[in-house]
Amino acid sequence: MSRIVARDLEGPDELAKSAAKDLASELKRLLASQKSVNLVLTGGTVGIKVLSELAPLIAQLDVERIQIWWGDERFVEANSPDRNFVQAREALLSKVLIPEANIHAMPSTEDGDLRAAAEAFSAKIDAYPPSFDVVLLGMGGDGHVASLFPGSSPMEIGGWVVAEPKSPKPPQQRISLSYVALNSAEQVWFLVSGRDKAAAVARVFNGEDLPATKVSGNQLTKWYLDKAAASELTS
């Protein structure tokens, strides 16, 4: 596994443009050599900026062969603006012709209680099962990725899904891909912006025990850092 670090980006806007351009190129390459491509999206301010930038760049690709997944989801009402799916729909999915059948949104509160909904989604993944080509991830100031938080003990629902009933960030209830699922990916791309993330970035690069340290791509791990997020790196 190799690691690439882009660490001199001026801010979140430049980060989003750079990552989106690279992702469009990678999707084009993958579509040329595979029958389908499995892409895992992330939420957050920077993650959604990337999707907005990506939309016009992939409009001419054969997007009908792209399968869309999410790293995690807030367990709220289906059309809540807090949902990563709803934000991604506005930024990307409403602008490109990816078939509805290819969009694998995580459950909402309309799908039962947290455990039941997570179990149903786990069964869907088990029946598929996807081979993730590229996973996009943000990272919190505490080093969390998806809804995998430091010191938390989420409910394990099968091998690929966990349910978090008491997230330290609101809303408390969340569904997330597990470490096993994230680490199954060929490529993992971290999108991290802001001075408030700098200490966690440095800790991850020093190999400290944080969720982000535990995730890497089998082929490639790529970090997109703006200057603020990279400000505490020493080398």
Kindly give the residue locations of the regions a language model identified.
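N-terminal glycine-/serine-/threonine-rich phosphate-binding loop
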Residues: M1-L39, R115
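Ligand-binding beta-strand-loop-alpha-helix segment within the catalytic cores
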Residues: S2-R3, E64-V134
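Glycine-rich N-terminal segment of FAD-binding domains in flavoprotein oxidoreductases
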Residues: K28-L57
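Glycine-rich beta-strand-to-loop/alpha-helix junction loops that act as flexible
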Residues: L41-V46, L137-G141, S193
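A glycine- and small-aliphatic-rich helix-loop capping segment at beta-alpha/alpha-beta transitions
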Residues: E53-D62, V86, E90, P150-G159
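A short secondary-structure junction signal
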Residues: A116, A146-G151, A200-V204, S235
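Class I SAM-dependent methyltransferase SAM-binding "motif I" and its flanking Rossmann-like core
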Residues: V134-L137, G141-V180
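C-terminal functional extensions of proteins
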Residues: L182-S235
